Regions:
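Walker B catalytic acidic pair
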Residues: 78
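Active-site-proximal or metal-binding-adjacent scaffold patches in catalytic folds
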Residues: 1-73, 82-113
C-alpha cells in the first residue's frame, strides 16, 4: 500500500509541475501577444520543443526538470515563431527584447544535450 501512495504522490507532483509549466507558457504568450492553439508535452529525443504549421506547440517533458530561465528561453523561442517563422534579425531582436541573456541560455541548452 505505501508503494501505491508513493506513486500517487509522484503523479500528483508531476501534475502540479505540468500545470505550472503550462501557466508559464500562457503568461509568456500574453506578453508576446500570441495565442497558442494547442500545447502538448511529450518525450522528445532531439528537440526541446516544436511548433507545427497549425499552431500546435509541443514541449519536451525534460523541460519540467531544468532551471526556470532555460525553460523560459525555450518557451519564448517557440512562441516567437508564431510571429516570426525564421531566426533572422527580427527574431533575434525580439529575443533580446524579452530575454536579454537568451544567447547564454541557448548555449547552455546545447551543452546539456
Amino acid at each position: 500500500m505505501p508503494m501505491l501512495l508513493s506513486k500517487n504522490r509522484e503523479c500528483l507532483d508531476q501534475s502540479n509541475e505540468v500545470e505550472k509549466f503550462k501557466s508559464n507558457i500562457f503568461k509568456w504568450a500574453e506578453k508576446l501577444d500570441v495565442e497558442p492553439k494547442e500545447i502538448h508535452l511529450r518525450s522528445m529525443k532531439n528537440k526541446w520543443a516544436s511548433l507545427s504549421q497549425n499552431g500546435r506547440l509541443t514541449f519536451n517533458t525534460k523541460l519540467l526538470e531544468i532551471e526556470r530561465e532555460l525553460c523560459d528561453y525555450v518557451i519564448v523561442h517557440e512562441l516567437l515563431h508564431m510571429k516570426v517563422p525564421n531566426h533572422g534579425k527580427l527574431f533575434k531582436s525580439l529575443m533580446f527584447a524579452f530575454l536579454p541573456d537568451w544567447e547564454k541560455y541557448s548555449e547552455r541548452l546545447k551543452v546539456d544535450r
